[in-house]
Amino acid sequence: MLLAVDIGNTNITAGLFLEDELICMWRMASNRAETWDEYGLQLIQLLERDGHTPADITCAAMASVVPPLNPVLSRAVQQYLKVQLKELTGDLRSLPAVRYDNPAALGTDRLVNALAGWEIYGRPQGRPVIVVDFGTATKLECVSAEGEYLGGVIAPGIRTAAEALTRRTALLQRVEIQRPKSVIGRNIAASMQSGILYGFAGLADGLVRRLTQEIAPDGPDPVVVATGGLASMVAVESRTIQMVDPHLTLQGIRLMYELNWPDAAAEA
C-alpha cells in the first residue's frame, strides 16, 4: 500500500491507498518542535488503530509546503515504517504541460491538486478545471482541457484572515467559523461570521468567473472543484463551486507518485 503525506502549514494529513482507493486517513499537527521519533510513534499508533502494521506499507510519497518538516517526516517514515518517503517536487512528471514561469518553484500542493482535478474531473469530460483549495491560504489552480497547468491565484485563507481580524483590532474577539442565521449580523459574532463565510464565498465566485473568462472564453466552462477543511461550508454558499472533494490532495500525491515511480506503485 502507498502512504501519501500532505505536509501543510497547519496540519499533516496522511492517507493509505490500496491501489486507487483511499482506505484510511489521519491528521497530525504541523509542529516544527516535534521530533522524528514523536511523529514516527504517532504514525504507528494511527496505523494500529485502523488495523494496519508497518509491513502493509510498501511505498510512501509526500507533498510539502513546510520544508523544515520534510527531513523530520522522512526519517520518521524510514525508521518506523521501513520505506523511503519520496518527496514530490515541481520538476517531476505531472500534467502534460506546466505553463509556469519556474515550474521548480511551484508548490507541490498546488501541482498535485491541479493534477488530481484534471485526471479525476476534467479529463473524463474533456473540460478545463479550476481547483479551489480552502487551506491556510486560499489557492485556485487552472488547468486547460488538454491538461496544461496554466497558473492560478493565491489569497489569504479563511482562518488566516479571521485570525488577522482579531489580532489587528481591539474590540473583535475570535469567533467560531460557522454559518450565521442571516447575512445581516445583529451582533458582533454573527457579523464576523457573515463577513468570513459569505465574504470568502464571494471571493471564490468572483475569482472563478474571472478565471473562466481567461481559461475558456469560447469553449466549455471549467469543472470547479473545491477541497480543504472549510470547503463544504463555503461550497453551500457558492454559485460557482460544483463539487467538493476532501481527499483531492491525497489523490494528487498518489497520481504523481504513480507517474514517476510506476513500478513501485504497481506493487502498492
Swiss-Prot record:
Its EC number is 2.7.1.33. Coiled coil: none annotated. GO terms for molecular function: ATP binding; metal ion binding; pantothenate kinase activity. The keyword Kinase applies. K(+) binds at D133. Its cofactor is NH4(+); K(+). It comes from the Bacteria. ATP binds at D6, I7, G8, N9, T10, N11, I12, T13, T136. Homodimer. Catalyzes the phosphorylation of pantothenate (Pan), the first step in CoA biosynthesis. This is Type III pantothenate kinase 1. It comes from Symbiobacterium thermophilum (strain DSM 24528 / JCM 14929 / IAM 14863 / T).
